[in-house]
């Protein structure tokens, strides 16, 4: 198999004629920071953790997508590499089993890439695009091997089911909920923060991240145990969504002015709260940062209650709750460093 460096070099050849890559300076010289660096987040009591195989898995997964995804230009290749999708997955799931982390990296990477495609589509076209991918993911329909999004998803889900059918199938429906939320017309009419957070729980893919974490860690819970985690997961979804929105706002605001009026429509907690409260964008971000730290405190309180409860708390449940904490702290670390937002 070619090394990642060899793959990048070979990919660059078809694009050397493109104006935007001729004599272009290194990436670090072309990146213009979008985020307001004068806004300092309040201190957190948490620390992030990254999966120990991050470098190895990132090279493997990035190499796979460089060979199979149809990037339109070498600039798009550099943007993809700068986003570090496998790194965020390893930050989301640092406790994943060594032989499962690559599955999670592949799934989140292809979903990020599909999200970028949808940004340039109408809701109707995006819905049709996703509806084609859903039965392929289930294994009910064979993929068109000329379309990377189809065969990548098909092969990935088949390999996940071969590894652990029960837990892989538990990830399916949450993935579809996430995909449907991407083209939900409700995002055009959200003007209240509470309504937004309810919608965003689907759009941020919280159920997907939770199910994928259980798959990656090999955790099995009864229906009652899963139900008992709902409040913790809902709280986690709010924190994840808002941290993501704070860091991605400037990039998404820019995209809303240049992209498709529906696919790139700006739907963000920053925008919603700014309009609702009549605060400026920097002030709104500061308010939202305070809210994220309060949700972290709520998480710690719920965890402490569960551990101290008379019914006790299994080691699997403790690992899962710690995993949710790492999702939040890992998401913040990635969001403030990825070139996707900065």
Curated annotation (Swiss-Prot):
Pfam families per the UniProt record, alphabetical: Terpene_syn_C_2 (PF19086)
EC numbers, comma separated: 4.2.3.9
PANTHER family: BETA-PINACENE SYNTHASE-RELATED, TERPENE SYNTHASE
Binding residue positions for Mg(2+) 2: 115
Chain segments annotated as coiled-coil in the UniProt record: none
Site (Important for catalytic activity): 92, 112, 178, 334
Keyword GTP-binding: no
Residues that bind (2E,6E)-farnesyl diphosphate: 340-341
Gene Ontology BP terms: isoprenoid biosynthetic process
Cofactor(s), names only, from the UniProt record: Mg(2+)
The UniProt record lists the keyword Magnesium: yes
Enzyme class: lyase
Induction: Expression and the subsequent production of PR-toxin take place under static culture conditions (oxygen limited), whereas no expression of the PR-toxin genes occurs under the strongly aerated conditions required for optimal penicillin production. There is a negative control of the transcription of the PR-toxin genes by the penicillin biosynthesis gene product(s), or by a regulatory peptide encoded by a small ORF inside the penicillin gene cluster.
Domain of life: Eukaryota
Binding residue positions for Mg(2+) 3: 244, 248, 252
Assembly: Homodimer.
Pathway(s) where this gene product acts: Sesquiterpene biosynthesis; aristolochene biosynthesis; aristolochene from farnesyl diphosphate: step 1/1
Protein name: Aristolochene synthase prx2
Binding-site residues for Mg(2+) 1, renumbered to this chain: 115
Family: Belongs to the terpene synthase family.
Role played: Aristolochene synthase; part of the gene cluster that mediates the biosynthesis of PR-toxin, a bicyclic sesquiterpene belonging to the eremophilane class and acting as a mycotoxin. The first step of the pathway is catalyzed by the aristolochene synthase which performs the cyclization of trans,trans-farnesyl diphosphate (FPP) to the bicyclic sesquiterpene aristolochene. Following the formation of aristolochene, the non-oxygenated aristolochene is converted to the trioxygenated intermediate eremofortin B, via 7-epi-neopetasone.
Co-factor: note: Binds 3 Mg(2+) ions per subunit.
Catalytic activity: (2E,6E)-farnesyl diphosphate = (+)-aristolochene + diphosphate
Keyword line: Lyase, Magnesium, Metal-binding
